[in-house]
Every structure is written in C-alpha cells, then in structure tokens.
Curated annotation (Swiss-Prot):
InterPro entries: C5orf34-like, C5orf34-like_2nd, C5orf34-like_C, C5orf34-like_dom, C5orf34-like_N. PANTHER family: CHROMOSOME 5 OPEN READING FRAME 34 (PTHR34531:SF1), ZGC:153352 (PTHR34531). Signal peptide: none annotated. Pfam families: C5orf34-like_N, C5orf34_2nd, C5orf34_C, Polo_box_4. This is Uncharacterized protein C5orf34. It comes from the Eukaryota. Coiled coil: none annotated.
Length: 638
C-alpha cells in the first residue's frame, strides 16, 4: 500500500489525498462517499483514462479500508463536524456508553480543578465528567482537544435514549478531580503554595501516573459492557488540532483556562513567563467565564441528503507529483506535505502557519499577504524561546544537513496563500454550496450573493458590489478588476484602505489572462486600482440608509422591481376598467361600425369624441397612484 505524499483539507471539509505511486483518494465534504483513482501503468496510453472506484464510505471494501481510515482521521482532525462510520473504526477505539453525551462541563476559572501540568510543559484541562480534555503545549501556537462523539447514524434514525433509563454510574476517577497535578519537578526551586490556591501533588512513581487521569489513560475510562446489553450508544474518541489564533467557539473557554493556568505555573516557577499567544485570548478570559458548558460537535449522518453536490477533481496527478506546483480546486484549510503541516485561517485576512514537525512554527506576518514569516522555536533542555523573521523576497540559503529547508517551506506556503487569494477573488461561488450545510427547502437565492450596488460610470465602465464583500469592475477597454472590500466596517474607524479584506486584487485581461496585483504597489495598473477603490470609499461614505446591508430580507429588497412593475400594470388596468372609458370606447366603436356602412372614413375621429375631461382625470389618478407606489417601495427598501 502506497504512502501518502500530500493530504489536503478544503474549506468545505472535503479531502484529497495524493500517494507516492500517483494514485489519489477524494472524500466528499460530508465524508459519506469517496472516489479512488488508481495510477495508470507505465505502458498506458497518455489518453487512457485511469481506473476509478467510487463507493459509499460506510460500505468500503477491505482493499481501501486502511487508506480511507487515515483520510477520515485527517479530515476529522480539523473538520467542523466529524464523520464516524462504525464499520471503519477499529473495535479497540469504540466505547459503548449508556448515556447520550451532547455537552461537557468544564471547571470554573476561580477554582483551578482537573488541571495537570506535565513534565514536557503540556497543560491538560479535563472536563468534570471526563468526556473531553484539552492539551496545550509549551509553545502555545496550537492545541489538541479530545472528546467523545457518537458514531454517525442513519439519516432516518429516531432512536433517542430517554434520560430515565440512561443513568450510568459515575466514574471513580471523575470523582477524584479538583486537583492540580504537576508531573516531575519544575526547573529551579519547588513550587510554594503561597496563596493557598494550588493543591499540588508531585507524582514520581510510574505506577501512580498510570492510575491518574492522564493523556494515555483518559481514553480508557469507559468500560465495555457485555455484548447483550441493550440501549447502548457507540462512541469513539475524536482528536482535533486547532490553531490558538483561530479557536472554535466551543473550545474557547477551556483554552482560556489552559492559558491562564500556564501563566500561573510559569510565574510561580520563575521560568519563561512570556506567553507568546496569550494575547489572543487573555482579554477574552473574563468574557468566557460563564461559558463553562461546551456543546460537543455532532457526527454527520451516514448518508448524504444531496449527493449530487459532490464534486470530484480529475487532474493529471503524474505531472503534479513530479513538481511542487499543485493545483488546488477549492479554498484550502489545511495541507500536509512530506511531514510538514500548513494550517490556514480565512477570518479577516489570509494567514498561514507552518508546523515543520520538530516543534517549531512559522507564522505569516505583514499586511494582508504574508510578506514576512516569523520563526518560533523552544529549546528542549533550557526551554529558551527563539524567534526569527524571514522576508519572502530575501530567503536564506539552504543549510546542508538541516531537517527542513526554510526557503522551500516559505515558498510552498506563499504559493498556497496565492491560491487562496485567487479563490477569494473568484466570482465562482461554488465553494459556498456545501452538501452537509444544505437544509431541505432552503432558497437558492440565499446561497448566491446579491448585488448591493451597481453603477455605470460614463467613459469608465460598470461597477458592481456584492453581498459577500466582492467588488467587480468592468472597464470599457475590456479589463476587469475584482477585489474584496468590507462595507460593514465603521466609517469613523476606517483608514484610507481599511475596507480591504485582501491586500491584492485580480486583473483579467481581454485575452483571458489573469494577474494578481498588490494594491499598495499597483504599477502599471494604478489607474484601474485607484478608480475602483475610490468608488468603494464613496459607497461606504454614503448615508446609513444607503449603506449596503446583509440583512436576511435583502433578497426581497433586491427583487422588488419585477413585482412592482406587475403591480403597476394591474393597478392601471383596474383603473381603466372602473373608469368606464373602455365601455364608452367600445360603445362608440359599435355605433361607428354600424354608421360606417353609410359614412366611411369617420373612424379616425372616434377617439376624439371621448370626453377629454374623463381621460385627464383617469391619467392624473394613475400618475398619483404610481407615485405613491414608488415612494412606498423606496421607503421600504431603505
């Protein structure tokens, strides 16, 4: 079985795995279906299509079971909702539990309970019920969280356990929580309990360590019931790894506990008390104080309700395997390549973190687009921190014997960032349509972005602003420009280009060629960039009533024109029918037709005989009604 060369997790939680022999495996965003593409033999014709196997994940055959299991573990490590098929999970990883676990309760911030400081510098926070725990390493750039999750069920499953029949005996280990345990001796003098806040137990015996609620022993708490036990749920431990800078909502409180506890331990032991990443969540500790309960992520169902939304990428894997250039069809969330992990965040701006595998981390810095990378590392013996900053335009030469090359890592990260910028500037919005996010009966207009503002500037071009913060400009010379602009940021706090979500824009030339342009240095396309950014600033400086909004009623507000025109026609027809003008015209016409037998040519004066006063009155009323309708619709739109 071939080893993995590259594993990619996209923003919609789909996975693509590339193997060293050229074969690829793709997982759907929901994880319920996979496509395995075998590598073509050497003697195969260049136009010959490779063999492809498409199967349901729940019914995978043994040939692809191991590869699929590793791909699912990679997906679940950073996915919003895991996919856990009972047929793929090994028996030793299954837990049969009598209760339905949907949330966990963490210790309060005032009473530091169930917190362990290990000899390696890892801080572990365990929930009061023992169903989840969080581990924060000494570097504090990323953290891992383990939690019990029920395996994926059928979509029509209605088996819900009642609370009265699901009272499981409490684990004895959970009852013995409320203590902070330090594994090994800290450097320097032993901790002193000056403020009577810590009850520390220094454990030296390996036998005692095994009995404690540690990382190796926590997952073995639940005991397997007898095979004949009824009304049990199958659970498994899910391990997820997240960046401290982009912590999900459900893990913010335990992470704030870990940072707070690590800071106390560092201050008391008089070792390195500088917390590099504490700036991300230190201000949020007081806000997260009341959120002691975390709702655990739920596994997706075994079958996908909308499998027609599954998209498969067919490309020349042989050419991509021979070079580091890789074509990513979607917005990337995480990439694993040759033992190095690249983790991206797309919240305010694109940023990337590089985990080389030896404990060191590279982080992209600079406005908008990773112009610099900062290197963080901690020496194992002394615990001394080391920081270096590298410029993308001036990378250091390769060092012989180094476990990794700084230049190659940063270049690979820059290419991934460039791809993410192109995807965010793309007008194709397919990445927003995700199968597991679809709700039955949802309106398709809620998925695609709306046109908030459209302007036609004479001798310049056409400008459009969309509800997903995209701005698209079509110039008269055939060049189109696309950029992201945040219209919702406050005007009083905005700087010159503060509305920019990305520091780059995309130019598309008449021949179809595309080019990324840095907005701060747009030469020789400064005229296009300046024109669009000036239009965006004027749009955001309008009155609050004219400001683009993202309200849920925007669909109705943008589709008012067709309905209003139809209503105008109906009102006008109703006025004509009730005014009696049509009846008079019809009667006059009938009389005239009978009279035309004797006086031909008199039909030209038929309309002139209608009472002019009634026509003017009807037209005046019609004009007033149409004016009132326009005022009403314009006020409702504001």
């Amino acid at each position: 079985m071939a080893a993995e060369l590259r594993m990619i997790l996209y923003e919609d939680d789909s996975v693509q795995v590339q193997y060293v022999d050229g074969s690829t495996l793709q997982l759907s965003p929901c994880g319920s279906e996979f496509l395995f593409e075998k590598s073509p033999p050497v003697s195969a014709h260049p136009l010959e299509q490779p063999e492809r196997i498409r199967q349901r994940t729940h019914f995978v055959i043994s040939t692809y079971r191991e590869q699929l299991q590793r791909a699912l573990d990679f997906r679940n490590s950073s996915a919003t909702c895991p996919f856990l098929s009972e047929t793929i999970i090994p028996s030793e990883r299954k837990k049969h539990i009598f209760i339905d676990i949907t949330e966990v309760r963490w210790p309060s911030l005032d009473t530091d309970g169930t917190m362990i400081y290990m000899e390696s510098g890892i801080v572990k926070i365990t929930s009061l019920d023992g169903h989840a725990y969080l581990c924060l390493p000494r570097s504090q750039h990323e953290f891992t969280v383990h939690f019990l999750c029920k395996v994926s069920q059928k979509s029509d499953s209605s088996a819900v356990l009642s609370e009265t029949n699901n009272k499981a005996p409490k684990d004895k280990l959970v009852e013995k929580t409320g203590k902070i345990c330090i594994r090994g001796n800290l450097p320097g003098q032993r901790l002193k309990n000056k403020e009577n806040e810590f009850h520390c137990q220094i454990m030296k015996s390996k036998e005692t360590l095994k009995k404690m609620s540690c990382v190796n022993g926590t997952e073995g708490r639940e005991e397997l019931p007898s095979p004949g036990t009824k009304h049990t749920c199958v659970y498994t431990w899910v391990k997820q790894c997240w960046s401290v800078a982009a912590c999900p909502e459900e893990w913010k409180y335990p992470l704030s506990l870990a940072l707070h506890f690590h800071n106390k331990i560092s201050n008391m032991s008089k070792i390195d008390a500088h917390i590099t990443q504490s700036r991300f969540l230190t201000s949020d500790i007081s806000e997260e104080r009341g959120k002691v309960v975390s709702v655990l992520p739920r596994a997706l169902s075994l079958s996908c309700p909308v499998p027609h939304l599954h998209r498969w990428n067919f490309c020349d894997s042989l050419l991509q395997r021979q070079s580091d250039e890789y074509s990513y069809p979607e917005l990337v969330k995480m990439v694993w390549y040759k033992g190095v992990t690249y983790r991206l965040t797309h919240q305010n701006m694109n940023s990337i973190e590089i985990y080389s595998g030896d404990g060191s981390v590279f982080k992209s810095e600079g406005a908008y687009f990773g112009n610099y990378f900062t290197y963080y590392s901690i020496q194992e013996g002394s615990g001394k921190r080391e920081e270096k900053t590298y410029s993308v335009n001036n990378l250091p030469p390769d060092r012989p014997g180094s476990p990794f090359t700084v230049g190659s890592l940063i270049k690979q990260a820059t290419r991934i960032l460039q791809h993410c910028v192109k995807m965010r500037l793309s007008l194709s919005h397919n990445y927003r349509i995700c199968c597991w996010k679809m709700v039955p009966g949802i309106n398709d207009s809620n998925i695609l972005p709306l046109v908030l503002k459209e302007s036609l500037i004479p001798s310049v071009g056409r400008f459009l602003a969309y509800s997903d913060d995209k701005v698209h400009a079509i110039f008269l010379d055939g060049i189109t420009l696309t950029l992201n602009w945040n219209f919702s940021s406050p005007i009083e706090k905005r700087q010159v280009n503060q509305g920019l979500n990305l520091g780059w824009c995309k130019l598309t030339f008449p021949d179809g060629q595309e080019q990324l342009i840095q907005i701060e240095h747009p030469e020789p396309y400064e005229r296009y960039v300046t024109t669009v950014t000036s239009w965006c600033r004027r749009l955001t400086q309008t009155s609050p009533r004219e400001m683009p909004t993202h309200s849920s009623s925007s669909v109705l507000q943008e589709n008012w024109s067709v309905a209003s025109e139809l209503e105008k026609i109906q009102k006008f027809n109703l006025l004509l029918e009730n005014s009696g003008i049509l009846n008079q015209i019809s009667n006059k016409k009938n009389e005239q037709q009978s009279f035309d037998h004797y006086k031909p040519g008199s039909s030209e004066t038929l309309l002139g005989e209608v009472n002019e006063n009634r026509v003017s009155i009807a037209l005046k009323k019609t004009s007033e009604i149409l004016h009132d309708i326009d005022c009403l619709l314009s006020n409702s739109k504001k």
